[in-house]
């Protein structure tokens, strides 16, 4: 039984790691914080938008939250950076920062706003989001609580609103949204699919341990093939990845204006993987099942952001499935579902799934037989 004399166990009730053991040793915070700032381009805005800014600007942004840039890939639409803690994507009109561990992502907000100001843009949309932390007591200010995060964000965006998606004592997301989109406006057709996965298949996680850092090349290609990550990031994508020492793995991929990013924490007691993409789809189930095929998690959460003019948004408005519904995942049981509409047609859907008991039992038997 939990006691008030055991504060970490009490805090763990709100965390995302099940069965917290205070004697388990060092753990890494896999679930990421995510900040997206979208810029309204006006007549005075630099013709290249945020691409007019050099790498030194982004090094400063990343440094402000206690991370570093490790590698970069780019095309006409996206500059992609793999960080020591996750990823940064810079597009002409937006910045997406995704950071794990105990990084202080909100410390980067004034630096991001300076970047928007430097190219004479206007802030149109801001979202800050994170899955509930696995080890919330390890976080640093301003991330010690949702209240502190909200208070920090409200300093910069007074009209922004906070939301919680999912049960507070289990898998949930904190989301803050500042919306200054002038409607009616041009077509809104953005999409975002994000997945967080826990209790990864141990036959897979063994591949993400190493006695040294390994950058993009033949060795990381072999890791992708052995783990079937090459099914997610096939040859149509330009990619850069990093195998960490002693463990962990990150990959960014870009294709035109589309991106994917995957981050993996393989330790048994806190195994975790995340996946995110903005790739358009009429149904997300094929992509989600491909990712699940790599990690075979015990449980996962999926959250999708759907604009009204996107392919999937038009289907949703007609009452059709978008691929996050339970019928597409027979090995898993739907735990709960949360839906919110921020603006006309702009929908967020969040689902929690757990592997069915009979599937878990079969997997355990198969492992023993092997």
Swiss-Prot record:
It is an enzyme of class 4 (lyase). The modification Pyruvic acid (Ser) is found at residue 86. GO terms for biological process: spermidine biosynthetic process; spermine biosynthetic process. It catalyses: S-adenosyl-L-methionine + H(+) = S-adenosyl 3-(methylsulfanyl)propylamine + CO2. GO terms for cellular component: cytosol. The record marks 85-86 as: Cleavage (non-hydrolytic). Signal peptide: none annotated. PANTHER family: S-ADENOSYLMETHIONINE DECARBOXYLASE, S-ADENOSYLMETHIONINE DECARBOXYLASE PROENZYME. Belongs to the eukaryotic AdoMetDC family. Forms a heterodimer with catalytically inactive AdoMetDC prozyme; heterodimerization is required to activate AdoMetDC. This is S-adenosylmethionine decarboxylase proenzyme. It comes from Trypanosoma cruzi. The lineage of its organism: Eukaryota, Discoba, Euglenozoa, Kinetoplastea, Metakinetoplastina.
């Amino acid at each position: 039984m939990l006691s008030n004399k055991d504060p970490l166990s009490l805090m763990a009730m709100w965390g995302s790691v099940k069965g917290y053991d205070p004697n388990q040793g060092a753990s890494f915070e896999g679930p990421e914080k995510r900040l997206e700032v979208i810029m309204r381009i006006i007549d005075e805005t630099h013709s290249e938008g945020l691409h007019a800014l050099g790498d030194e600007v982004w090094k400063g942004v990343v440094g402000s939250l206690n991370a570093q840039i490790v590698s970069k890939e780019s095309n006409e639409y996206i500059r992609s950076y793999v960080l020591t803690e996750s990823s940064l994507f810079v597009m002409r009109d937006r910045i997406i920062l995704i950071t794990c561990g105990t990084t202080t992502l909100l410390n980067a907000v004034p630096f991001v706003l300076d970047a928007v100001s430097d190219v004479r843009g206007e802030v149109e949309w801001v979202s800050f989001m994170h899955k509930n932390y696995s080890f919330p007591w390890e976080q640093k200010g301003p991330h010690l609580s949702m209240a502190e995060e909200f208070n920090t964000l409200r300093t910069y965006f007074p009209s922004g609103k906070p939301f919680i998606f999912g049960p507070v004592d289990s898998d949930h997301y904190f989301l803050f949204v500042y919306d200054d989109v002038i409607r009616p406006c041009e077509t809104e057709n953005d999409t975002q699919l994000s997945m967080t996965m826990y209790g990864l298949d141990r036959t897979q996680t063994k591949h993400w341990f190493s006695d040294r850092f390994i950058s993009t090349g033949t060795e990381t290609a072999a890791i992708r093939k052995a783990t079937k990550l090459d099914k997610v990031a096939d040859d149509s994508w330009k990619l850069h990845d990093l195998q960490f020492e002693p463990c962990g793995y990150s990959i960014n991929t870009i294709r035109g204006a589309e991106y994917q990013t995957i981050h993996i924490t393989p330790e048994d007691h806190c195994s975790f993987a995340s996946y995110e993409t903005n790739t358009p789809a009429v149904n997300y189930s094929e992509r989600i099942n491909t990712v699940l095929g790599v990690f075979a998690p015990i449980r996962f959460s999926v959250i999708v952001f759907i604009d009204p003019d996107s392919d999937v948004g038009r289907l949703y408005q007609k009452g059709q499935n978008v691929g996050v519904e339970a019928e597409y995942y027979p090995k898993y049981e739907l735990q709960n579902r949360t839906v919110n509409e921020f603006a006309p047609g702009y929908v967020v859907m969040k689902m929690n799934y757990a592997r069915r008991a009979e599937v878990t039992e079969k997997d355990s038997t198969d492992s023993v037989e092997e």
